[in-house]
From Swiss-Prot:
The protein, known as: Interleukin-1 family member 10
rRNA-binding recorded as keyword: no
GO cellular component: endoplasmic reticulum-Golgi intermediate compartment; extracellular space
Keyword Secreted found: yes
Amino acid sequence: MCSLPMARYYIIKDAHQKALYTRNGQLLLGDPDSDNYSPEKVCILPNRGLDRSKVPIFLGMQGGSCCLACVKTREGPLLQLEDVNIEDLYKGGEQTTRFTFFQRSLGSAFRLEAAACPGWFLCGPAEPQQPVQLTKESEPSTHTEFYFEMSR
């Protein structure tokens, strides 16, 4: 678990109450009751090196031992979990933009925009048990809106 006092843990759900979880190195979205898994307790820390008005955050999984990253490929931006400790990112020990997401408020919901790929947002899959992706979507939808439920 992350030892920094400002670390906050959340269970992140979509509009249909499906929660984020990790399995086999992938970030998935599903129903904990029917999919037989435990929701991921996502550790969130701010990225102090970017404009605070955009609410830049790091998303740490598995107790903060790996983080969600946006990687540029020929096919477009790709989400992946990387073995990078969230505390190291917070302390500024590595290039951090690809691990940063801007938390955009929509009332009680949020959209998560990849700092490394402006205009690309975290998006829940259309099919169950598929990886969470990035989409270039200008308007909010139920696939790009997420709710943060405090955990611990």
